[in-house]
Swiss-Prot record:
This is Error-prone DNA polymerase. It holds the Pfam family DNA_pol3_alpha. The lineage of its organism: Bacteria, Pseudomonadati, Pseudomonadota, Alphaproteobacteria, Hyphomicrobiales. PANTHER family: DNA POLYMERASE III SUBUNIT ALPHA, ERROR-PRONE DNA POLYMERASE. One of its GO terms (biological process) is DNA replication. It catalyses: DNA(n) + a 2'-deoxyribonucleoside 5'-triphosphate = DNA(n+1) + diphosphate. The gene is dnaE2. HAMAP family: DNApol_error_prone (MF_01902). One of its GO terms (molecular function) is DNA-directed DNA polymerase activity. GO terms for cellular component: cytoplasm. It comes from Sinorhizobium medicae (strain WSM419). Belongs to the DNA polymerase type-C family. DnaE2 subfamily.
């Protein structure tokens, strides 16, 4: 400290004091060290969510740090800074915060003084007087009560307010402390590290208080002084109270706790007096006998012994037993589940039934999962059916209790959209301007705001207010907004979890989470079990049930994995993969005809190769070239026999993280632990840049082993190209099995596949409209939602519904393969606004069927609003009622006649079924029907919206999607359609891939970055788009490379050109009036003739139609 008084700041908070603190924990630590503070304590508001980040940074900086919390009470008690002086004290702090969390809704913590008195043991406490004006008389009884319990562990905090009254207030508080016999302690009560962050603190205050900065007044800090100050400056400020500075050192030195003391205690999973090691060995032995019924191969047995020995050395047996217990429970309940990720490298996991990939078949690397040289717990991810995962979660709570099991947190941070909107609001920008500013932002990214985006929103980029919004929105990005629950990471402990970390309620009943996220847990080496949800498992489970129920063919995933059918691979090679797991995206479909998968390992490669890692590492084209050469009989040359063993399965091109590790071990002399550090560096190099530290060792190691320097450098650059996107082979292998299973189901039973996909929504790449279209192209008859035939889920019905000639010519090869005989009846789940419980009542009361709208209303007890939704969805056709007639009948129901449902009338036979009287209503035109279908169901079985424009499109030279296959490559073409998908992969250098749809199918569009910048509003905002560009046809994969885009969404108004207005809020008994005024008709005429971009805005009718159409899904 060289002459400076030792000062320890204990009142600092971070941005984990949500919308109060204005700096990240890591930056607080770095700045504190730079400012020569002797040590730093972090005390966030009723939370320890940010302390692990500070702890990790402090260890890296070799800087003294202590975790604590600022206790803010609901009963008027002044704030108290609480710090644990040992491990027991930390447990008490966690129990105290947990008590406040569990009595509150998610995000709140309701503390009372009684909580502190109950849990104050082993805590050092600093009472912080009110910042507005200290009230000594109210402090006296509080200090007396706390001193009675805490004794010399209690201090009174002095924090300057820089308002001219500090000298007076300090004197008053010093008197109170002296009379109470407690010490004074100095703090600057820091909200941020650097005074330059004061404006950001004002912005977060305005966001928190829901007022603009300009109107926040006294809510804002009076100055920029609440930052980390140097010891010299603090000594000057407290020159009259040097003991307050000295006491910070005394206080800090009594804190002997470190977060590194937290150790995960695994639950006891002993059975029948066995030790965990004995139980695990027995279960693995039994599982191995099942996996290898003809005897366990010697190589596999050696691997099992090696893994069990390492697991025993690490004392991880209880962890494996816990995961096995969860999987065993799921299977006992017939819940489909499958382990994935690095656990698929383990033969023990395979034998326990946790994973379904035999590591010996895929040459997987166990050290990727668990290493003797790596001091960290293994990470096992298990996917469960997403609709039934809650059963597994509740089993965990029933088995272990919330005191021993909790979900990890997920830190929800500000992204571009949320930061832009909130900051613009804080600076008083109108809601329209806020929306315009964020509308051009891609997805949920966190790229800084640009002046180009501001100008695109109609703002003056040179205006000081605009510049402030851009600057502070960019600064706020990645700041935490709140804690949410992790997608499935569970921490399960033997000792009380709420003495390790505070637990809290979630937004869902009977679920509890902790305050730390997965990175915090990794830092502290606290083990979690990932209980994840996967929609495709739900789809397959429902599909298997339909297969057994309707076709009498029970089947399991394991049986499908063994059933490698050429017809399945034929379908995959044609890229006929809409709905198929992992290979349904535009990029995957483009790769399939070139890769030509013919076996399971080809699917492993397919899953992994269309990823940013292989693309950025320049591995895709070399691999495809060698695969083409292999088909021609060409041999691959390898630099050495050792590398051939590593790379032969991928034709000499490293595609997986495991191969990068094996190259380092085999060719460069790395130890397994060094190779694993290389893998970690690959995973984080974009954030930390540490991969370069391995370059010299790897290149020189390979040269020393006889490899050419140029080859060694190229090898390293390929590995570096993986970046944080490198794909583990074990993960790809786990997913490849689900690729095949879903493709198998689609190949033979497209009716089941369609129904199962619809019943597993939301999931996947495509909306229900595209799934239904694809099923119909494969000859599946799809029937509409109907009150007398539908259930909540889609059903199969009828026999002999499949006709070979109904299969689209593009899938003609499937006509002799498809085994479908059923039709798919759409389920009520597709109707917007309906509840499953209501539809359950409808089905339960249906009996022989409903005879009228009144009959349905009377017997089911459903409200009229529910019946209106059903009528809107055109679900009364079995009664002979079209949409308008059904709405008329529902509207005619007299709410007063609810008395008819009284017991007096039950079974009396006094009521007729009241068949709806015939009313002559104008027929709803086809275009209007389609609009309503999309509005209520997001799809239409009657027609595609674009079909109503085809005449106009054909006159202006717009091709159908189907016609592109017969068009010469390189030719200029114009296409138009509804925007289904926009995809902007991180590896694509700003390129956008769009998928549009017309009445004949889909067209894939490539939008280069330069074109995207020029037509950004059209790409991002169009629901119906017209595109001119050059056709590319490579190996049957067709794209249009866009040169010009035009938003023709107003043309959707053409669906109503023959219709009368019958909008979302109109009903059949409403006045039927002409559609649109002369001005609107004039616009529609202009549209039919080809409305130029940027012409008049669409009329009201066109806007209503556009609102009913899909916006398009955005993917990264």
């Amino acid at each position: 400290m060289s002459g400076d008084t030792a000062f320890y700041e204990l009142g600092a908070c971070t941005n984990f004091s949500f919308l109060e603190g204005a700096a990240p924990a890591e930056e607080m630590v770095v700045f504190a060290k730079k400012a020569r503070l002797a040590g730093l304590g972090i005390a966030d508001r009723n939370s320890v969510a940010g302390v692990v980040r500070a702890h990790a940074k402090a260890k890296m900086e070799n800087y003294p740090f202590q975790p604590g919390a600022r206790l803010v009470f609901a009963d008027g008690t002044p704030d108290v800074l609480a710090y644990p002086r040992n491990r027991r004290g930390w447990g008490h702090l966690c129990r105290l915060l947990s008590a406040g969390n569990l009595r509150s809704k998610k995000g709140d913590c309701t503390l009372h003084l009684a909580d502190l008195l109950e849990w104050q043991e082993e805590l050092l406490l600093i009472v912080m007087p009110d910042r507005v004006r200290p009230e000594p008389e109210s402090l006296k009884p509080l200090l007396g009560k706390l001193q009675e319990h805490a004794g010399n562990r209690l201090y009174l905090g002095l924090a300057p307010r820089y308002d001219g009254f500090d000298r007076h207030d300090f004197a008053v508080l010093a008197t109170v402390a002296r009379k109470a016999g407690i010490g004074l302690l100095a703090t600057n009560d820091a909200l941020y590290h650097d005074p330059d962050y004061r404006p950001l603190a004002d912005v977060v205050t305005a966001i928190r208080e829901h007022v603009p900065v300009a109107g926040a007044g006294f809510l804002l800090q009076k100055n920029a002084e609440r930052h980390l100050k140097s010891p010299r400056e603090m000594a000057r400020l407290f020159s009259d109270y040097p003991e307050a500075i000295a006491n910070t050192q005394k206080f800090f030195r009594h804190l002997a706790f470190s977060l590194d003391e937290l150790r995960h205690q695994y639950p006891d999973e002993n059975a029948g007096g066995e030790t965990p090691a004995e139980s695990l060995r027995r279960l693995v032995s039994e599982g191995a006998a099942e996996r290898y019924p003809e005897g366990v191969p010697e190589k596999v047995q050696r691997q099992i012994e090696y893994e069990l020995e390492l697991i025993n050395d690490k004392k991880y047996e209880p962890y494996f037993l816990t995961v096995h217990k969860l999987v065993k429970f799921a299977r006992s309940e017939k819940i489909l589940c499958q382990g994935r990720g690095s656990a698929a490298n383990s033969s023990v996991c395979f034998c326990l039934g946790i994973t379904d990939v035999d590591p010996q078949k895929f040459t997987l690397l166990f050290d990727r999962f668990l290493s003797k040289d790596r001091d960290e717990p293994p990470d096992i991810d298990v996917d469960f059916e997403h609709e039934r995962r809650e059963e597994v979660i509740q089993y965990i709570y029933r088995t272990y209790g919330k005191e021993h099991a909790g979900l990890a947190a997920a830190v929800i941070s500000y992204r571009s959209r949320s930061a832009g909107r909130e900051v613009a609001k804080a600076f008083g920008f109108s809601e329209d301007v806020q929306s315009a500013l964020v509308s051009s932002i891609w997805g949920w990214g966190n790229s800084p705001f640009t002046e180009e985006q501001a100008r695109g929103a109609g703002l003056d980029a040179a205006d000081p207010s605009t510049r402030r919004v851009l600057a502070y929105a960019s600064l706020l990005m990645n700041y935490p907004r709140h804690l949410s629950q992790h997608v499935g990471g569970f921490v399960i402990t033997r000792d009380r979890l709420d003495e390790v970390v505070p637990i809290m309620n979630t937004a869902m009943p009977d679920r509890y989470m902790i305050e730390w996220d997965k990175d915090d847990l990794d830092e502290l080496k606290i083990l979690k079990v990932d209980v994840l949800a996967l929609g495709m498992l739900t789809c397959l489970a429902k599909g298997f049930k339909l297969l057994e129920a309707h076709y009498g063919e029970p089947i399991t995933l394991a049986e499908i994995y063994q059933d490698h059918q050429p017809a399945v691979y034929d379908m995959i090679c044609r890229a006929d993969t809409v709905g198929v797991f992992q290979i349904e995206s535009r990029a995957q479909m483009s790769m399939l005809p070139r890769l030509q998968p013919r076996e399971m390992y080809d699917l492993v490669i397919e899953v992994a190769i269309v990823r940013p890692g292989p693309i950025q590492g320049n591995m895709v084209h070399p691999y495809l070239k060698r695969r083409e050469g292999q088909r021609k009989g060409e041999k691959v040359k390898y630099p050495s026999p050792e590398l051939k063993a590593v790379l032969e399965r991928t034709l000499g091109v490293p595609l997986f993280q495991e191969q990068a590790m094996q190259i380092a071990i085999t060719a460069a002399g790395f130890s397994p632990s060094e190779a694993d550090r290389l893998r970690r560096a690959m995973a984080t190099f974009k954030r930390t840049g540490t991969i370069h530290t391995f370059e010299r060792k790897m290149v020189e190691g390979m040269v020393a082993n006889g490899y050419e320097r140029e080859f060694a450098e190229r090898c390293f650059n390929q590995i570096k190209g993986f970046g944080e996107y490198g794909f583990p082979e074990s993960h790809a292998a786990s997913f490849a099995s689900l690729v095949y299973a879903s493709a198998w189901l689609k190949t033979y039973y497209p009716d089941i596949f369609c129904a199962a996909l619809l019943n597993a929504q939301p999931m996947g790449f495509y909306a229900p409209a595209q799934l239904v279209r694809d099923a119909r192209e494969h000859g599946v008859k799809v029937l509409p939602v109907d009150i007398n035939h539908s259930d909540w889920d889609a059903l199969l019905e009828g026999e002999g519904q499949f006709r070979k000639e109904s299969v689209d010519p593009r899938h003609a090869d499937m006509r002799e393969v498809i085994k479908t005989r059923k039709a798919v009846r759409l389920g009520f789940r597709l109707v917007k606004g309906l509840k499953q419980a209501d539809m359950g009542a409808l089905v339960a009361c249906r009996g022989e069927g409903y005879r009228s709208v009144h009959d349905l209303w009377f017997r089911s007890g459903l409200s009229r609003s529910v019946l209106e939704r059903l009528a809107d969805a055109d679900a009364f056709r079995s009664l002979g009622l079209d949409r308008r007639a059904a709405l008329w009948a529902v509207k005619a129901l007299d709410e007063q006649s609810a008395v008819e449902r009284l017991p007096l009338f039950e079974g009396a036979g006094s009521l007729d079924l009241r068949a709806e009287p015939k009313v002559a209503l104008p027929e709803m035109p086809a275009g209007e029907q389609v609009i309503h279908d999309y509005r209520t169901l997001t799809l239409s079985l009657k027609a595609h919206p674009v079909s109503f424009m085809r005449e106009d499109f054909s006159r202006t030279g717009i091709l159908r999607s189907r016609d592109l296959a017969a068009t010469a490559t390189g030719k200029w073409v114009t296409v138009a359609g509804l925007v289904l998908v926009r995809q902007r992969p991180g590896s694509a250098n700003g390129v956008i891939f769009m998928t549009i749809e017309d009445e004949t199918g889909i067209a894939n569009i490539i939008v280069w970055e330069k074109t995207f910048r020029k037509y950004r509003p059209q790409v991002m905002g169009s629901r119906l788009v017209k595109i001119r560009g050059r056709l590319q046809n490579q190996s049957g994969v067709i794209h249009v490379v866009a040169d010009h885009l035009e938003d023709i969404t107003p043309m959707l108004g053409l669906l109503r050109r023959e219709a009368r207005r019958f909008g979302a809020n109109d009903r059949a008994d409403g006045a039927l009036r002409p559609s649109g005024d002369a001005r609107e008709k004039r616009k529609l005429r202009q549209l039919r003739l080809g409305l130029p971009g940027g012409a008049e805005p669409e009329g009201e009718a066109a806007a209503q139609v556009a609102e009913a159409m899909p916006k398009g899904r955005n993917f990264h």
